[in-house]
């Protein structure tokens, strides 16, 4: 959750959410996994890649035993190359390897090496939405929010990165 836990779209940074979890039989390396989405408003791929690299390097690479695999829900001809923005965290000691039927960058770190697929796919989608509900009690707010989250999470590909959130996203702000 670390890499998706910082609300930041309102200040022009990448935002993320967990779409769901995968069984061992559903991942390339046979371990439990999570499907995570990252979003940035607009169509500036270079800025998105730069911002995404922060999330990966600061919140995923530093966790022991992590691998990042591409997991697009639909085929895409657009992708981000990971070597320049993440792979070189190996300070020249990184290398590429073919494992699990994928081309991976192996980044040597303390416990053990971090691996990330050479290319991660880009897809377009709709980002940001608000569900407003009016309640008379705090308990009703939480119960209504839980029901809304359950409904959102039952939709394939949908994420609710902030669970029940007291703030609403907007495309621009006067006070970041």
Region spans (language model):
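Short cationic amphipathic helices and targeting signals
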Residues: 33-41, 128-135
């Amino acid at each position: 959750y670390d890499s998706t836990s910082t609300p930041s779209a309102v200040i022009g940074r990448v935002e993320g959410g967990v779409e769901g979890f995968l069984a061992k039989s559903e991942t390339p390396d046979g371990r439990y996994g999570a499907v995570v989405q990252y979003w940035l408003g607009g169509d500036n791929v270079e800025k998105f890649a730069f911002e995404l690299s922060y999330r990966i390097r600061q919140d995923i690479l530093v966790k022991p035993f992590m691998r990042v695999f591409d997991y697009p829900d639909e085929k895409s001809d657009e992708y981000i190359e990971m070597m320049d923005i993440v792979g070189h965290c190996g300070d020249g000691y990184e290398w590429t390897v073919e494992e699990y039927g994928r081309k991976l960058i192996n980044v040597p770190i303390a416990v053990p090496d971090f691996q990330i697929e050479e290319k991660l796919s880009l897809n377009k989608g709709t980002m940001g939405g608000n569900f407003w509900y009016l309640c008379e009690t705090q308990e009703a707010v939480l119960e209504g929010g839980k029901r809304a989250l359950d409904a959102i999470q039952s939709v394939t590909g949908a994420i609710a990165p902030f669970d029940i959130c007291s703030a609403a996203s907007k495309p621009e702000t006067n006070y970041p």
